[in-house]
A protein has these predicted regions:
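Alpha-helical multipass membrane-protein architecture
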Residues: 44-706
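Cationic, low-complexity basic patches in intrinsically disordered or flexible, solvent-exposed regions
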Residues: 6, 20
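Short, Lys/Arg-enriched N-terminal segments with co-localized hydrophobic residues
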Residues: 31-48
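Low-acidity, Ser/Thr- and Arg-rich intrinsically disordered low-complexity segments
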Residues: 2-3, 9-12
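Residues marking helix boundaries in flexible regions
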Residues: 9, 24-26, 45-48
Length: 706
């Protein structure tokens, strides 16, 4: 009997007889003939068994040991369904829906929700409901395409509505769909292209060094939805708790969203007289964010907040309380002493944070010079050598778009930006050249800052960096002879392109980290991100024009658009001979340099000075919970199990809160008002439910067994 005719024992043929047999070899199912022989290769029936996804590897969130490699859930040696008609079409649909919702909510209240988590939840739910097999790769692609919505919206609504606001005062200033669409589209494309050379550094080489809070939460949603079991149950329960909790706050207002020391009589007196104030956002989503960020970074961020709110603001009141200080010629008439602590923060102290972020960013750029140099060197080397099989040698999960294509793409995009500026924004070729240089230099350099911020706290300080861009652009444009309404238009379009580039770059690093953990192909994520950017830019442009005609940005009942109003308030005086708050920027710069000298991470500290304290305090509480649950035992494995359980709970809080944020936005859009009348007890009563979810998170994690 020849070797290929030997009877084969298998689960379906334990006796080794000649019955029709299926045998599993690794993960391949082979059909054998009745005589036990293998069929001809043309007729071999190979069926890939459905892979059972359980959870992320143990080393997914920690630094790797020397020689240790991270192995993603999807094997780098295999190909999986990623780009399919299902994933592309659903990704586009998600982009349109969430772009419209985020644009309305952002212009209405100034807050843009992150779409990645809700889209991941929807993708997992649909794939499970339709019983799609091995859908994890598809779901990553759906999330990656769809998440363009929040990034493009943030880039657009922070700057471009300022054009409509100024148009009301200067009728000669023109705004149309083309300006909004192209500034969003070109900025988004630049953000993607500028980030690709840094993907490996942030995603692979810095593995375990950054918490990537939003990427962690989104990945947990995708993996738990695919795996089922205890992880999915924990995520579902915590998601329901966090979602219901945040929905009650945002839709009904049963208790206050913010708990402040002013709810107590002594706190109100101290806030009025000394301008000393502490606030905590009581939302479950922000608490979960703090848990994932961890105690180290949360503490540094809060130190920045404490410096501003407990030292700088009270000192300003003490020293200049009786004076009117108008650093930007914006028409401020109140004395410092007559302002609230919130007003002092908004008009003065926050600019210190902007100066700190800009300086910390520049320091980070200098420190990252080696990374930038290697990225540029890689690009240069691809042009100097002939095409080889090098790309084929790179494993699937580390394969990017060719650096040659990236460089050519950047050059072409900047050329289109030049054409856009020359034909649709300014009348002078020289001004168009200057505009392109500003866009290219600032967007490239601050891409690393945006990615760094997202990796640390999950929050992109894009409005602060954009404000700095607007000021620099205004100074340069005035210096080359462009001012007045033409200068305002040019500076705001430049700011819109840069803002969108930084917003997309920050959001995209989250997508790429998700793909790295799961095992997606970066090249596919990068390629199809451009489609999401195109769809989101078109949607945002159309929605913004409709909202302007429906509500407007000025007058009674107008959309608030707080960031755009701030941009308009800054740029108008500068283009008409005003100035910027250089003293405050300088103070922030000095603080960042001192921190760098003492080896304290300056960027998270500066973020704390810029982000309102009510969003930073719960991060400290969440970070403290993560420290507590991961240090209670002498058993390292038990501590890790507790930490992982807490991460699932925190991810559920974030996911539930994000999803209910979308529901609340829809209700607001439909003008469904179920909000209770505010009363004196709504704020202090928030202590009870907030303490309850803190205790739930800690106890549920502590009870975990190995």
């Amino acid at each position: 009997m020849s070797r290929n005719q030997l009877p084969i024992r298998s689960p379906s043929n334990p006796a080794g007889n000649r019955e029709p047999t299926y045998i599993i070899i690794g993960e391949v199912l082979l059909f054998l003939h009745n005589n036990g022989t293998l069929p001809d290769h043309e007729s071999i029936r190979i069926i890939y068994m459905e892979e059972k996804i359980t959870q992320l590897p143990e080393n997914a969130h920690r630094e790797l040991k020397p020689g240790e490699e991270y192995q993603p859930l999807l094997s780098p040696k295999k190909n999986y369904p990623e780009v399919t008609p299902w994933s592309v079409v659903l990704g586009i649909v998600m982009t349109i829906i969430f772009s419209a919702a985020a644009a309305y909510l952002g212009l209405k209240v100034g807050q843009v929700f992150e779409a990645a988590i809700p889209i991941a939840i929807i993708a997992v739910g649909l794939s499970s409901g339709l019983k799609r097999k091995n859908a994890l790769g598809e779901n990553v692609m759906i999330q990656s395409i769809g998440s363009c919505s929040g990034a493009i919206v943030a880039g657009a609504i922070f700057t471009l509505p300022a054009l409509f606001i100024l148009q009301d005062k200067y009728p000669e200033l023109t705004v149309n769909f083309t300006k909004v669409f192209f500034s969003s589209l070109l900025g988004g494309i630049l953000g993607i292209l500028f980030l690709i050379p840094f993907r490996k550094y942030f995603v692979k080489e810095q593995h375990g060094k950054y918490p990537f809070p939003e990427a962690t939460a989104t990945t947990q949603v995708l993996v738990s939805g695919e795996s089922g079991g205890k992880g999915a149950k924990t995520l579902l329960i915590s998601g329901l708790i966090g979602g219901l909790y945040d929905f009650i706050i945002s839709t009904f207002g049963v208790w206050g969203e913010t708990l402040s020391t002013t709810c107590f009589k002594w706190g109100a007196v101290v806030a009025d007289k000394a301008k000393v104030l502490l606030k905590v956002n009581t939302g479950a989503a922000v608490l979960g964010l703090g848990y994932i960020v961890g105690l180290k970074y949360a503490f540094i961020i809060c130190c920045g907040s404490f410096l501003v709110w407990l030292v700088i603001i009270p000192l300003m009141n003490l020293i200049w309380g009786g004076q009117v200080i108008d650093l930007m010629n914006t028409g401020i008439t109140q004395t410092i002493g007559d302002m609230s602590a919130d007003q002092i923060f908004k008009d003065y102290a926050r600019h210190i944070g902007i100066g700190g972020i800009a300086t910390a960013g520049i320091v980070g750029i200098v420190k990252s010079f080696g990374v930038i140099k290697s990225a540029l060197g890689l690009a240069a080397s691809e042009f100097s050598k002939k095409k080889s099989g090098a790309e084929a040698e790179v494993i699937r999960t580390q394969r990017d778009i060719s650096m040659k294509i990236v460089v050519v793409g950047i050059v072409i995009t900047l050329a289109v930006v030049f054409g856009f500026f020359a034909l649709g924004v300014v009348d002078n070729i020289w001004h168009a050249v200057v505009g392109v240089l500003i866009v290219g230099i600032i967007a490239f350099l601050f891409t690393t800052v945006a990615a760094n911020a997202i990796a640390i706290v999950g929050s992109n300080p894009v409005s602060g960096m954009t404000l700095m861009t607007l000021i620099l652009a205004s100074l340069v444009m005035v210096a080359v002879g462009l001012n007045g309404t033409a200068g305002m238009t040019a500076a705001l379009i430049i700011g819109g392109v840069v803002c969108t580039a930084l917003s997309v770059a920050g959001a995209f690093i989250t997508d790429l980290k998700i793909g790295y953990w799961i095992g997606s192909t970066p090249k596919k994520q990068e390629s199809w991100k451009f489609l999401g950017t195109l769809v989101a830019a078109a949607t945002v442009g159309g929605v913004m024009l409709v909202l302007n005609k429906t509500y407007g940005f000025t007058g009674e009942g107008a959309l608030v658009a707080p960031q755009a109003n701030a941009m308009a308030a800054v740029i108008e005086p500068m283009m008409n001979g005003g100035s910027a708050p250089w003293l405050l920027y300088g103070i922030g710069a000095v603080i960042a340099l001192v921190l760098t000298f003492f080896k304290v991470p300056a960027l998270p500290f500066a973020l704390g000075m810029f982000i309102p304290i009510d969003l930073n305090m719960p991060m400290l509480i969440g970070g403290a919970i993560s420290w507590y649950v991961s240090t209670r035992s002498n058993d390292k494995e038990l501590n890790e199990a507790r930490m992982e359980k807490g991460t699932l709970i925190a991810s559920g809080f974030i996911a539930g809160g994000a999803l209910m944020g979308v529901v609340s936005a829809i209700l607001r859009f439909a003008e469904v008002d179920m909000f209770m009348e505010p009363s004196p007890w709504t704020e202090p009563i928030a202590i009870i439910p907030y303490a309850a979810i803190i205790i739930y998170m800690a106890i549920a994690a502590i009870r975990t067994k190995k």
